[in-house]
A protein has these predicted regions:
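Non-catalytic accessory regions of SAM-dependent methyltransferases
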Residues: 1-56
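Conserved hydrophobic residues forming the short capping helix/wall of the S-adenosyl-L-methionine
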Residues: 25, 122, 176, 251, ...
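Short helix-capping segments at alpha-helix termini
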Residues: 29, 155-156, 177-182, 254, ...
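Residue-level signal for inorganic ion chemistry
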Residues: 38, 81, 111, 146, ...
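Conserved AdoMet
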Residues: 41-121
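Conserved SAM/SAH cofactor-binding pocket of Class I
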Residues: 113-220
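Mobile active-site "lid"/loop adjacent to the S-adenosyl-L-methionine
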Residues: 212-243
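Conserved Class I SAM-dependent methyltransferase catalytic core
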Residues: 238-302
Length: 304
């Protein structure tokens, strides 16, 4: 009972906390909208209640944690630049609510386009059996976001989600479980294609958001990213292309003829990636696609 009691606050108390938090957010260059997102998660308040401040008159609101703990986490957001997604433990992505921790990269909105591109790539292909079926790989799955997206658009496919980090795979498995997709996604620990060697030549497609940031660029990233997100998922080596080169080189062995090769990359890498794909000699119909901001962000090709 005491535990529940410590998590109960009056609407007025929470209203006062919210106003103070918004003020401190403004003062420290944190988007004030994060306050309401946080309260939506920990207090179950919807956007309307927050916008109209109708909760101010409620006699009591049960939080997921005591108000003092919430304040401590908010101070970490302000002063340690801890991402709000790690504070609440979830982030929205496509139609999902995805669990995240500091063991995984926070899935970005632009990465959602990989799923749309995969769908379009299979729709325009005349390959038999259809590319929407069979085996698909999400290499470097992290939170499992891409694997979940693929499982949703390809209900007849088996998705193999690979990651080097066992902690990341635990989060990805949790997400698949929460979304009732565990029967369609197989989680495998290992490096890129290695643990899938028994399925060489059988994959309808491979999708990856690999590490693509040059090592020397990492310290220039936002503190939220540099200090809190896993460098294993960010560091792409001297020119940022180590992992992408590997995926270009190795993937033809695993893809079936006509199979899809699709990755996300950094702004400014498109020309080199396109050239690497052409020079490899095992790909055709090589395409570069922009993200929603018009930046050349995705490379798509088919196995010859």
């Amino acid at each position: 009972m005491g535990d529940i009691q410590s998590k109960l606050v009056s609407g007025l108390q929470l209203w006062q906390w919210r106003h103070q938090a918004i003020k401190t957010a403004d003062a420290t260059d944190v988007p004030p909208a994060e306050v309401d997102w946080l309260l939506g998660e920990v207090a179950g308040l919807d956007r309307l209640a927050l916008r109209l401040e109708s909760f101010k008159d409620w006699p009591e609101i049960e939080l997921q944690l005591p108000l003092e703990d919430l304040e401590q986490l908010w101070q970490r957001r302000l002063h340690e630049r801890l991402p709000v997604q790690y504070i609440v433990g979830v982030t929205p992505w496509r139609h999902f609510k995805i669990a995240v921790s500091s063991a995984v990269l926070i899935p970005r909105p632009e990465t959602e386009s990989l799923i749309d591109l995969a769908l379009a790539a299979t729709a325009s292909s005349q390959t038999t059996p259809p590319l929407q079926q069979g085996h698909w790989a999400d290499l470097g799955t992290g939170s499992g976001a891409i694997a979940l997206g693929l499982a949703k658009i390809f209900p007849q496919a088996i998705i193999h989600a690979v990651d080097y980090s066992s902690e990341a795979l635990a989060i990805a498995s949790l997400n698949a479980n929460n979304l009732q997709l565990t029967d369609r996604i197989r989680f495998v620990q290992g490096s890129w294609w290695e643990p899938l060697a028994s399925l060489k030549g059988q994959f309808s497609g491979m999708v990856s958001n690999p590490p693509y940031i040059p090592t020397s660029t990492l310290p220039t990233l936002q503190p939220e990213v540099f200090h809190h997100e896993p460098h294993l998922a960010l560091d792409g080596g001297a020119d940022g292309l180590d992992c992408i080169r590997h995926l270009i080189e190795i993937s033809p062995t695993y893809l079936r003829p006509g199979g899809v090769w699709l990755i996300e990359m950094m702004a400014g890498q498109a020309d080199i990636v396109q050239e690497l794909l052409q020079n490899q000699g095992c790909y055709y119909n090589i395409q570069i696609h922009p993200d929603l901001a018009g930046i050349e962000r995705f490379a798509l090709a088919y196995k010859s």
